[in-house]
């Protein structure tokens, strides 16, 4: 149903967040988990997966990670902070763009990583705290790692006065340090200086991963051009741009392209600015309060497209910008370019809401390249009708009419899709499905309502009516399945739940209770940063057959997201290298160590695995 909505709502996914990109789940299948063989042997300890070294040379600290084949480091999970010392901007290369179903657009390192950390204002007891996290491509993630590096005194003004210390293999210190001394912090996600050597490779990979974004923004721009606030202005705008006198088609084409490039420059700069801000707040964008706030904002923007109220720049600001634009000389390339750049700032009531939504999408992606190109494509789409009018005259433009209001309303439905995409991360699947159904019913109901008022009739009108009816049924089906489906299955879903444990003592207590009851135990180690843990929860544990079998188990879950002292002790107690890890005990209370599962496993092989108990 979602694919149908995306097509018929003209690019519904334009405002989708990076979190919609799906991992290919098959690649995470752990074939070794189909038997009780020890699957833990297939993953190495974190110090072997990401060997870490550092050395200090005067006022510079060099950090070095080697990345084992088949593993990767998260750029967004890498941070460097200082105690009793100030740190400059990190000098490092950007990671490779990577789409994650649960974490959205992230950047990863699959090759050795070198980071240069400038040091300044050394004080007694100075040290640098390095935090990082990585995963195996097979769907196995390590807990966040912390390395504490003591910093030797240095004299920044004398470059050659000190001799570089010997590269040192670091030792882990996973305890969080609560510093009472002055602290400087540098986050990799907000301070990156791309290395010139890898810039081309990074750009190519980014474009390859996001090839559809510019196309959808181009289509969005064309759609905005046909709203009632924009389309009637093109003939007037064309006369202003071209100036007085007759011009050849070639000259008219050139001037119109120059105007559109000026407008595209403004939009591109807007995209770069908000994408830069988005990189700093990318982690915060995942917080439920932020997601709810953004959803309310999108709904507010959508209401303006439905005509509930008018959303635009203050009239005084628009008047000032218009006067500034009118002072430019039409017919000259420089004047036309300036008019285009200024006009990009004049948001009409029809374009303010979609443009705001587009900027929010770009801000959440936190990707400079994608942000700049997407907004450039949006401006080019809006400029296509202007180019057509300038070259061929007004005869190519469709006549103004009620159809333009319908285009505006359609954009309102597209904007309403954005909050559903955002809220899917925090809402139960039942509620997100209900919201999608409600949006589909509203959109296709509106389409059926307006079919009789369309300018054309005959078989085209009938076809639209059929599409609307089919869309209504398709949209309502998921909600109907929840309301009138198999109540027995739904009852099973509500009875499967985990008991949370926080430390070793609570684990021992629950194991003793399960042994007394004669029931096997399953312990799931979970963390919010673990992608495969969320896949287990979404695709495996909610399978009806798996849920039925899990009724025979005592289900325990340890949430180690915060990586506190008690979490580390529990992980060490169970000899857990990373997540996801699932442990089993039989009905006699014996730990079945060779039944351990590491890495994602789909429902069918997981069911075969637990059926052995």
UniProtKB/Swiss-Prot annotation:
GO biological process terms, alphabetically, are:
cell redox homeostasis; cytochrome complex assembly
The reaction(s) catalysed by this protein are:
[protein]-dithiol + NAD(+) = [protein]-disulfide + NADH + H(+); [protein]-dithiol + NADP(+) = [protein]-disulfide + NADPH + H(+)
Q: What is its EC number?
A: 1.8.1.8
Q: Does the keyword GTP-binding apply?
A: no
Q: What class of enzyme is it?
A: oxidoreductase
Q: Which UniProt keywords apply?
A: Cell inner membrane, Cell membrane, Cytochrome c-type biogenesis, Disulfide bond, Electron transport, Membrane, NAD, Oxidoreductase, Redox-active center, Signal, Transmembrane, Transmembrane helix, Transport
Q: How does it sit in the membrane?
A: Multi-pass membrane protein
Q: What is its main location?
A: membrane
Q: Where in the cell is it found?
A: Cell inner membrane
UniProt cross-references to PROSITE patterns, sorted A to Z? THIOREDOXIN_1 (PS00194), THIOREDOXIN_2 (PS51352)
Ranges for region Disordered: 166-197
One GO molecular-function entry = electron transfer activity
**InterPro entries listed in its UniProt record:** Cyt_c_assmbl_TM_dom, DsbD_gamma, DsbDN, DsbDN_sf, Thiol_diS_interchange_DbsD, Thioredoxin-like_sf, Thioredoxin_CS, Thioredoxin_domain
Q: List the disulfide bonds.
A: 135-141, 229-350, 530-533
Per the UniProt record, which residue ranges are transmembrane?
215-237, 252-274, 287-309, 341-363, 370-392, 407-424, 431-448, 463-485
- The signal peptide stretch is 1-21
User: Where are stretches of biased composition, namely Low complexity?
Assistant: 167-196
Q: Which residues form the Thioredoxin domain?
A: 468-613
Q: Name one GO cellular component term.
A: plasma membrane
What function is annotated for this protein? Answer: Required to facilitate the formation of correct disulfide bonds in some periplasmic proteins and for the assembly of the periplasmic c-type cytochromes. Acts by transferring electrons from cytoplasmic thioredoxin to the periplasm. This transfer involves a cascade of disulfide bond formation and reduction steps.
- Tell me which family the UniProt entry assigns to this protein: Belongs to the thioredoxin family. DsbD subfamily.
Query: Any idea what this protein is called?
Result: Thiol:disulfide interchange protein DsbD
Q: Which organism is it from?
A: Vibrio parahaemolyticus serotype O3:K6 (strain RIMD 2210633)
**Gene name of the record:** dsbD
């Amino acid at each position: 149903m979602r694919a149908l909505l995306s097509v018929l709502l003209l690019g519904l996914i334009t405002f989708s967040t990076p979190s919609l990109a799906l991992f290919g789940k098959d690649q995470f299948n752990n074939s070794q988990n189909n038997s009780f063989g020890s699957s833990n042997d297939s993953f190495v300890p974190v110090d072997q997966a990401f060997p870490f070294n550092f050395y200090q040379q005067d006022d510079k600290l060099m950090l070095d990670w080697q990345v084992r084949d088949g593993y990767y480091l998260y750029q967004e999970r890498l941070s460097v902070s200082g105690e009793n010392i100030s740190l400059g901007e990190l000098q490092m290369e950007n990671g490779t763009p990577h789409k994650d179903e649960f974490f959205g657009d992230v950047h990863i390192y699959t090759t050795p990583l070198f980071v240069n950390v400038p040091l300044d204002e050394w004080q007694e007891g100075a040290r640098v705290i390095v935090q990082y996290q990585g995963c195996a491509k097979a769907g196995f993630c390590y807990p966040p790692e912390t390395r504490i590096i003591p910093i030797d005194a240095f004299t920044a003004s004398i470059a050659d006065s000190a001799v570089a210390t010997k590269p040192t293999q670091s030792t882990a210190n996973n305890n969080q340090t609560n510093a009472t001394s002055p602290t400087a912090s540098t986050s990799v996600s907000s301070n990156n200086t791309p290395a010139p050597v890898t810039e081309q490779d990074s750009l190519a990979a980014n474009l390859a991963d996001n090839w559809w974004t510019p196309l959808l923004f181009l289509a969005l721009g064309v759609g905005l051009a046909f709203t009632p606030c924009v389309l009637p202005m093109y003939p007037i705008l064309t006369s202003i741009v071209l100036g007085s006198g007759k011009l050849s088609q070639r000259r008219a084409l050139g001037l119109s392209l120059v105007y559109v490039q000026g407008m595209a420059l403004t939009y591109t700069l807007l995209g770069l600015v908000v994408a830069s801000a988005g990189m700093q707040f990318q982690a915060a964008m995942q917080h439920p309060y932020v997601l709810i706030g953004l959803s309310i904002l999108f709904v507010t923007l959508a209401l303006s497209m439905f005509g509930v109220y008018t959303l635009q720049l203050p009239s005084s600001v628009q008047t000032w910008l218009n006067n500034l634009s009118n002072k430019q000389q039409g017919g000259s390339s420089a004047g036309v370019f300036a008019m285009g750049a200024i006009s990009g700032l004049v948001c009409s009531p029809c374009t303010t809401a979609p443009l705001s939504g587009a900027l929010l999408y770009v801000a959440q992606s936190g990707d400079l390249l994608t942000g700049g190109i997407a907004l450039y494509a949006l401006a080019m789409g809006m400029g296509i009708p202007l180019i057509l009018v300038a070259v061929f005259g007004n005869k190519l433009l469709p006549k103004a009419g009620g159809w333009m209001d319908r285009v505006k309303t359609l954009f309102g439905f597209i904007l309403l899709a954005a909050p559903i995409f955002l809220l899917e991360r925090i809402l139960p699947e039942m509620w997100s499905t209900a919201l999608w159904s409600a949006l589909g019913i509203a959109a296709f109901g509106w389409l059926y309502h307006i079919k009789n008022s369309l300018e054309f009739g005959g078989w085209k009108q009938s076809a639209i009516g059929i599409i609307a009816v089919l869309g209504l049924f398709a949209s309502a089906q998921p909600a109907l399945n929840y309301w009138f489906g198999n109540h027995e299955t739904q009852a099973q879903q509500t009875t499967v739940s985990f008991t949370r444990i926080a430390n070793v003592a609570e684990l021992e207590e629950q194991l003793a209770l399960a042994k007394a009851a004669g029931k096997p135990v399953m312990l799931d180690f979970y963390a919010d940063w673990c992608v495969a843990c969320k896949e287990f929860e979404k695709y495996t544990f909610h399978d009806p057959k798996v849920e039925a079998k899990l009724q025979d188990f005592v289900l325990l879950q340890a949430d180690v997201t915060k990586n506190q002292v008690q979490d580390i002790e529990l992980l060490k107690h169970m000899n857990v290298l990373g997540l996801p890890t699932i442990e089993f005990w039989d009905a006699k209370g014996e730990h079945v160590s060779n039944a351990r599962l590491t890495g994602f496993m789909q429902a069918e092989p997981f069911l075969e695995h637990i059926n052995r108990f």
